[in-house]
Amino acid sequence: MDHRLLEIIACPVCNGKLWYNQEKQELICKLDNLAFPLRDGIPVLLENEARSLTSDESKS
């Protein structure tokens, strides 16, 4: 994931900052507790493609 891209893109739901989870290949919005997948290195920033974070994931 290109870190320059992370400086530009935002959560499509709240326009908040996204955090990269390299292990799970996801972009995380901590404000909405959503995880957006990366497919072939490309962020899929569609609300209906996001998964809700578990309570344990939200705390970290």
UniProtKB/Swiss-Prot annotation:
It comes from Salmonella arizonae (strain ATCC BAA-731 / CDC346-86 / RSK2980). NCBIfam families: PRK11827.1. This is UPF0434 protein YcaR. The gene is ycaR. SUPFAM superfamilies: Trm112p-like. It comes from the Bacteria. Belongs to the UPF0434 family. One of its GO terms (cellular component) is cytosol. InterPro entries: Trm112-like.
